[in-house]
Amino acid sequence: VELCDVQAPEFAQHGDHAVAADAPLVLVACSGGRDSMALAAVSHIVCTSMGVRCGAVIVDHGLQEGSEQVAGEAANRCRALGLGPVIVRNATVQARGEGLEAAARQARYNELCAAARESGAIAVLLAHTMDDQAETVLIGLLRSRGVDALAGMPQVFTRSGVTFARPLLTLTRAETTGICEDLGVEYWDDPTNGDAVDGELPNDYPLRSRVRHDLLPAIERFAGFNVARHFAESARLARMDKEYLDQRSDEVMGEAVTTVDWPASSAAVSTDTPRACAAGDTNDSGHGVGLMIGVRRIAREPEAIRLRVIAHALSQAGVNASAAQIAAIDRLVVDWHGQGGVSLPRGYSANRKKHVIRVCQDGAHANR
């Protein structure tokens, strides 16, 4: 978000100016920790100097004893800094298969988006630092692979129609601590970070806390230099590659992939192109949602693009396929010798017929 784009004209001139009551609003997501309190303090100074309102939103996850008090203290500190409005929201965290950390993150973003929409904020600022970026890269490598794992967190992104920005990705946690000390800003240290624990953290601590407390320091001792900065710069470069690959894949997907509502049964149709199949498979005898992938179009692309197109298409259809399943579908494109279809989650399957790969939940339909 470029604040200069929403700056009130009079604030470009010297002198004291009051921020208008209807000026654009930016919200700082604040947990009360050192990073978010530093961001709140600096954001208020910068926004006020540009005629932009600066508020805060505090999300109480209710997962720790005393969380209500922590949220209240964070809100009071933000008000003391001059931020307004200061919004406190209570999140409902329901951990399912994704784990407690992921469920808490989803609940937090739900509340941040709701607060932004209700207040009319033009953006929500997040206090992730260079250290957080390095931790994210390591977690990505542990849980995933490829350029997406290396790309870390984007500086600006949109979620549920709300713009989020991370202004502190070039600052370290030591620097945000210094900002708080220089400005006399008090902050809260989350006990789940394990800062006060001697030795390795137990396995029941959050993965990010263990990476921060144990893994990153061990790598730094081994490497003999600031690996957080190294990982963060690697993430920036990998994100540029990822954004290009995503853009190119989206272009190819728009030409090669069609999402369709298939009937349970229909007369035989031409299978030379995905759009021909989609047009022919229409009647009122029932349907299933699926994909048609044009082999001739996608086969012209390099493997990196083909795999990305297949993965993105399946994701949009609600199919969370593994890397092995995506590679098997790619073999239907470039190594077709009459092999059988590929079984996918949620009862889906992918089958090739002439120059089209059909992905649907009705295996018999896909094999017609």
Locations of the language-model features?
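Extended, compositionally biased low-complexity polar/Lys-Gly-rich tracts
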Residues: 23-39, 45, 203-223, 280-314
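Short, glycine- and charge-enriched coil/turn segments that flank and shape catalytic ligand pockets
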Residues: 18-23, 48-51, 94-97, 118-121, ...
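Mid-to-C-terminal catalytic/tRNA-binding core of tRNA(Ile)-lysidine synthase
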Residues: 2-11, 250, 254-270, 277, ...
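Core alpha/beta nucleotide-donor-binding catalytic domains of modification enzymes
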Residues: 1-216
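Residue-level signal for short amphipathic helical patches enriched in basic/charged
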Residues: 107, 132-133, 145, 171, ...
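Mid-to-C-terminal catalytic subdomains of enzymes
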Residues: 177, 183-236, 240, 309, ...
